[in-house]
Design a protein with these regions (language model features):
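C-terminal non-catalytic interaction/assembly regions of soluble proteins
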Residues: 57-63, 68-167
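Accessory alpha-helical/coil subdomains and C-terminal extensions
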Residues: 1-82
Length: 167
């Protein structure tokens, strides 16, 4: 799991099963569905600092020290964010160790555009993508983190890209 530590984001080990092999309640991943729609921005432009709801959600997840993730419900059928500001924040979440899956709205029967740092959950509703992301988090754990999620290095991007591909 990842959490906000003293001045940076750190990776922490966490138990998933008890001595009898049963899933621990605290190990169940916390995966939120973030919806994006047309005209959702409060201001014109692509300033992520104005998207306080997503900033608060990312900060809350990093404060938990648990397995966490996001499913972005965007355009149908492509699953893309309409807002560049919200897309930038979802990339920051990924660079902070929080995996992001993207789906189309409603009951899409198409594809989600592939992205090197986001999971394209093609042919899935947001609920199904959420359950699969929870299973992936239990199997693979959190993504690698960048020391500075706003400015990841090339090596950090390579490690994150490789981990996202495993999902």
């Amino acid at each position: 799991a990842t959490r906000r530590g003293a001045g940076s984001i750190e990776t922490v080990e966490m138990a998933v099963k008890d001595a009898d092999g049963k899933l621990l309640a605290d190990a169940i991943p916390v995966v939120s569905i973030a919806k994006d729609g047309g005209y959702s921005g409060l201001e014109f432009g692509d300033d992520p600092s104005l998207e306080l709801d997503l900033i608060a959600s990312i900060d809350h997840k990093l404060g938990m020290g648990r397995l966490t993730g996001f499913v972005v419900e965007g355009l149908t059928p492509y699953g893309t964010n309409l807002s560049q500001a919200r897309h930038k924040l979802m990339l920051k979440a990924t660079f902070s160790g929080i995996p992001v899956a993207k789906v189309g709205r409603g009951t899409p029967e198409g594809f989600a555009d592939p992205h090197e740092f986001q999971i394209a959950a093609s042919n899935l509703t947001a609920i199904k993508a959420r359950l699969l992301l929870m299973a992936c988090l239990l199997r693979f754990g959190s993504l690698p983190t960048a020391k500075d999620p706003d400015h990841p290095t090339g090596d950090e991007l390579d490690a994150i890209r490789k981990a996202v591909a495993a999902y």
